[in-house]
Curated annotation (Swiss-Prot):
Keyword DNA-binding: no
Name this protein carries in UniProt: Putative membrane protein insertion efficiency factor
Organism classification: Bacteria, Bacillati, Bacillota, Bacilli, Bacillales
Keyword vocabulary terms for this entry: Cell membrane, Membrane
GO cellular component: plasma membrane
Family indicated by similarity: Belongs to the UPF0161 family.
Compartments it resides in: Cell membrane
Pfam entry (one): YidD
Cystine pairs: none
Source species of the chain: Listeria monocytogenes serovar 1/2a (strain ATCC BAA-679 / EGD-e)
Amino acid sequence: MKKILIGGIRLYQKYISRFTPATCRFYPTCSAYGIEAIQTHGALKGSYLAIRRISKCHPFHKGGLDFVPPKKDKNADSEHSCKVHHHH
């Protein structure tokens, strides 16, 4: 599924985006963000992040730097919740 979604974005980049004026208000561009989000977070969450980003790409939003959030390490969360009891 990831390959299909990324392939669709790459088709957009190659056959549509390059022939239209640059209008993305963000860096990285929304299409580059979408690819990175899907690669980092998978098809479902990555698509959600990409759609959320695209919905902000309009003239009434200031835009700017907006990077894909890093993937949370599930092991890091569980390490904090484990308590070790020392018996004396």
